[in-house]
Amino acid sequence: MADNAPDLHASVPPPGTESIVYPFAPPAPDASVVEVAPGILWLRMPMPMQLDHINIYLLRDGSGADAGWYIVDTGLNTSACKALWEEVVATRLDGLPLKGLVCTHFHYDHAGLARWLTDRYAIPLWMTHGEFFTMRALGERLPEPAPEGLVLF
C-alpha cells in the first residue's frame, strides 16, 4: 500500500460502539405503513421469535386505471399475518388493487404466504426459478423409501 493511501478504517468506530440512525420511525406491527418515498410503503409483519418482525414493502405502479401495488415479500403463513394483509389491502392502498407479488427468496418469512396471497388476490408471483423450486422441494415430502439418487447424494 502506498504511504499516502487513505486509511479506510480510520473513521469506523470499534464494534459495539456505533449506533444505527434510522431516517424513519418503524411502522407498528398492526397494519400501519410508513411511506419511505413516493409510492413506496414499508410495513412490518409479526414473527413469534426473537427477530419479531419481517420488513415488507409495497410499490405503487402505474397511474389512472392501471395504478396498483406490488408486494415485496409476504410474512409468515399464520392467521395473524393473513388478517394483517386483509386490513392492509382494505385500508392502506388508496383503494387500488394488488398487481403482483415479488418474493426475494424462499425463506418461510419471505415467501410463506405466497400461495395464499396469489390465490386470494388473483395476482402473479415473481421469484427466481432456483428460489421457487427450492421452496417447492422443501415443502414436498420425500417418498418412502427415498429414491436411490437422493440416498447417494
State the predicted function of each range.
Residues V12, G16-S19, E35, A65, ...:
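Alpha-helical context
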Residues I20, R44, N77, V102-C103:
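A generic structural signal for short
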Residues D30-L96:
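Conserved beta-strand hairpin/beta-sheet module of binuclear metal-dependent hydrolase folds
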Residues P23-P26, P38-L41, Y108:
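Short amphipathic alpha-helical surface micro-motifs
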Residues G16-T17, I71, L98-G100:
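A short, structure-level motif marking secondary-structure boundaries and short turns
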Residues M1, I40, L51, A65, ...:
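Generic low-polarity alpha-helical segments
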Residues A80-K82, E86, A90-F153:
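Active-site HxH/HxHxD metal-binding segment of metal-dependent hydrolases
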Residues M1-S32, G139-E148:
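Accessory terminal helices/loops
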